[in-house]
């Protein structure tokens, strides 16, 4: 499907930043909830990435759930010209320091 390159870049940047995209199965929806572009563009761009094996698709209750694969991370890193140390949000683990309770003697 033909779509403006800046819309495709927005979709790819969001996918790489978050690691996942949720899209409602509504092809007539004027705008995607999180990405500033048409919902149809989001669905079709991610279907294209799914057919290439860069994204896994899960469909449930009228929503598409797209998850980035390892090959997809490499592809988007090359497509967006990003360095190796930048990773999607799903790869980052927050470290919460656990504190032990203080002993009373």
UniProtKB/Swiss-Prot annotation:
Keywords: Cytoplasm, Ribonucleoprotein, Ribosomal protein
Stretch forming the signal peptide: none
Subcellular localization: Cytoplasm
Record GO biological process: cellular response to amino acid starvation; cytoplasmic translation; positive regulation of protein kinase activity; ribosomal subunit export from nucleus
Assembly description: Component of the small ribosomal subunit (SSU). Mature yeast ribosomes consist of a small (40S) and a large (60S) subunit. The 40S small subunit contains 1 molecule of ribosomal RNA (18S rRNA) and 33 different proteins (encoded by 57 genes). The large 60S subunit contains 3 rRNA molecules (25S, 5.8S and 5S rRNA) and 46 different proteins (encoded by 81 genes). eS10 interacts with GCN1 (via middle region); this interaction is direct and promotes GCN2 kinase activity.
Record family assignment: Belongs to the eukaryotic ribosomal protein eS10 family.
Physiological role: Component of the ribosome, a large ribonucleoprotein complex responsible for the synthesis of proteins in the cell. The small ribosomal subunit (SSU) binds messenger RNAs (mRNAs) and translates the encoded message by selecting cognate aminoacyl-transfer RNA (tRNA) molecules. The large subunit (LSU) contains the ribosomal catalytic site termed the peptidyl transferase center (PTC), which catalyzes the formation of peptide bonds, thereby polymerizing the amino acids delivered by tRNAs into a polypeptide chain.
Protein name: Small ribosomal subunit protein eS10A
GO CC annotation, single: cytosol
Species this chain originates from: Saccharomyces cerevisiae (strain ATCC 204508 / S288c)
Note: Present with 54100 molecules/cell in log phase SD medium. There are 2 genes for eS10 in yeast.
Gene3D superfamilies the record matches: Winged helix-like DNA-binding domain superfamily/Winged helix DNA-binding domain
GO MF, any single term: RNA binding
Protein modification: The N-terminus is not modified.
């Amino acid at each position: 499907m033909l779509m403006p390159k800046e819309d495709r870049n927005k979709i790819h940047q969001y996918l790489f930043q978050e690691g996942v995209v949720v899209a409602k199965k509504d092809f007539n929806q004027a705008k995607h909830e999180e990405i500033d572009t048409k919902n149809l563009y989001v669905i079709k761009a991610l279907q294209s990435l799914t057919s290439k094996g860069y994204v896994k698709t899960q469909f449930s209750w009228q929503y598409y759930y797209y998850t980035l694969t390892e090959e997809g991370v490499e592809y988007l890193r090359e497509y967006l010209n990003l360095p190796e140390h930048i990773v999607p949000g799903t790869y980052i683990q927050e470290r919460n320091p656990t504190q032990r309770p203080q002993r009373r003697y």
